[in-house]
Amino acid sequence: MAARRPGLIALFDVDGTLTAPRKVVTPEMLTFMQELRKVVTVGVVGGSDLIKISEQLGSTVTNDYDYVFSENGLVAHKEGKLIGTQSLKSFLGEEKLKEFINFTLHYIADLDIPIKRGTFIEFRSGMLNVSPIGRNCSQEERDEFEKYDKVHNIRPKMVSVLREKFAHLNLTFSIGGQISFDVFPQGWDKTYCLRYLDGFNEIHFFGDKTYKGGNDHEIYESERTVGHTVTSPDDTVKQCKSLFLEN
């Protein structure tokens, strides 16, 4: 068996990269990741919290990968152990947080879209996730909203309003997944996790939303990473085989 390549890590987005959006990882992908882990250090970085990442990648996720960065790395695990956390509440303060949440809920209340469900704002330790349709919609409703959003630009328009209204808070708005966007302080995008990877001189990042405004863009563009755009989990496997397993 080939020895692990020192100083190199392969870092993966979750949705659209290791799994279909919000779907559970396939057994084939899990097996492939374990094979890959024999030759390179492997990490995952997702915008979701650890509970959601575990639902997609499995309950043993923090042990299946060398590094697991949930909420863009604001909650960081290495070899199964928690190594760092950051809190939006302590960073912004309750008053500013409340001002933002109140305005956003008013905006959604006035929004004319075909359907609305529930959980329009999800508070995570390092970010807010905002969904105009509501996070507890069905998968079918998710798919429908995604199509509707592509035509009517519900999320981009909402982000534009919030960005202007709350310019003084220096927030980043990142559209990801099918139905929502993340809101967090500038610099708390996926590049945040790189502070834990100083021991690596070659960081390969794989993600699907690497375009400007996508939640993989900043880490993809970072001078510290070699960025790879993927179109699906199958494409991720194909690119990794070519890069790490066939030479």
Curated annotation (Swiss-Prot):
GO cellular component: cytosol
Coarse class of the protein's main subcellular location: cytoplasm
Enzyme class (EC, first level): isomerase
Active site residues of this protein: D13, D15
A GO MF term: metal ion binding
Cofactor: Mg(2+)
Catalysed conversion reaction: alpha-D-mannose 1-phosphate = D-mannose 6-phosphate
Alphabetic keyword roster: Cytoplasm, Isomerase, Magnesium, Metal-binding
Gene3D superfamilies: 3.30.1240.20, HAD superfamily/HAD-like
Associated pathway: Nucleotide-sugar biosynthesis; GDP-alpha-D-mannose biosynthesis; alpha-D-mannose 1-phosphate from D-fructose 6-phosphate: step 2/2
Binding site for Mg(2+) 1: D13, D15, D208
Positions that bind Mg(2+) 2: Y220, T225
Cellular location(s): Cytoplasm
Keyword rRNA processing: no
Family: Belongs to the eukaryotic PMM family.
Subunit: Homodimer.
Protein name: Phosphomannomutase
Taxonomic source organism: Glycine max
